[in-house]
Amino acid sequence: MASVKDFSDMKARVLTVMATRSQDQEMVEKTARMYPTPSGQDPSNAPSRYVVPAFGWHPWFSHQLFDDRDKQRQPDPVEHYKSVLVPAPEDEDFLRSLPAPYSLKEFLHRTEARLTEFPFALVGEVGLDRSFRLPEGPSAMTGDVSSKTGGSEGEYTPGSREGRPLTPYRVNLDHQKPVLRAQFELAAKLRRPVSVHSVQAHGLVFDLMQSHENPSKRERKKKADTTNAHASDKANNGPEIEQSLPFPPRICMHSYSGPPDALKQFLNHTVPADIYFSFSTAINFSSVSSAKAISVIKAVPDDRILIESDLHCAGETMDKLLQEIVHKVCEIKEWSLEDGAQKLKRNWIKFVFG
């Protein structure tokens, strides 16, 4: 939050700022109020800087939620964490260091209110993660001082990891999946795009999408016959069917790390959403995986590619990372810098605003 003021000095004129856990939701809301998305005009051509907020619960923190949508009783914190973490922790000190679990039902209620208040807000960052391990010890608290990367010195974000050693404990995927599905359903209800974090879980994310496949022509015709619909085929393919699908309209696979072959699955016409793929130098070009990222970027359709900094601090470093990834994508795609920048801008506008 301390680096937000550095946005006013950045070359970037629009930032998409995403929540990840309980402490972030209000911070993102405050930032969106400081730099409101313009209304009454095309936001993509606004003359002033603005923030597109995104509200969601990241899989790294999904253990902090308990699913009470079908029950009222709040679980015992220790028993809750033993049931959602693998292996089940026996370390009492570690268990006591974890925050009291938060109601998924309440989180969804509050998130819907925020999404309603901010009509251009996204759902994110959400997703699935097989590899993440919880850090040791208590999380950073408000008032602890941090030197922000590329931004101003200020407080740690409450609840953050901030370089602590990792434990052997992971969040059970059987717990992560209903948390993700619930947020997908909320995004579908309000027709909002979603940013998805997926690490070693692209197949599981795809399975979730596949569980809500677009109906085939035969299925649409059968539905129309059953309901005695006399509208044209075009009408049957339109808003009524779209609204009946419990799925978001657009999904971005954030800092996509999957193989090129998986793109065909995500881009299949049966997937009930327009899938975009974003890339960052911080994630996609920071290791030996760079060669894979190059082959993936070459294979992504020109109108489905996005770029990002994947940095938590506004300021010069964020500008630098954004510039680097624009140059990298243009080089790989063999676009001129000017043409590539315009393509990426159009893609972002289409993803965010539809």
Regions found by a protein language model. Name each.
Residues 320-354:
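Mid-to-C-terminal alpha-helical segments outside catalytic/metal-binding sites
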Residues 231, 237-241, 259-269, 286-299:
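Short loop-to-alpha-helix "cap/lid" segments that border enzyme active sites
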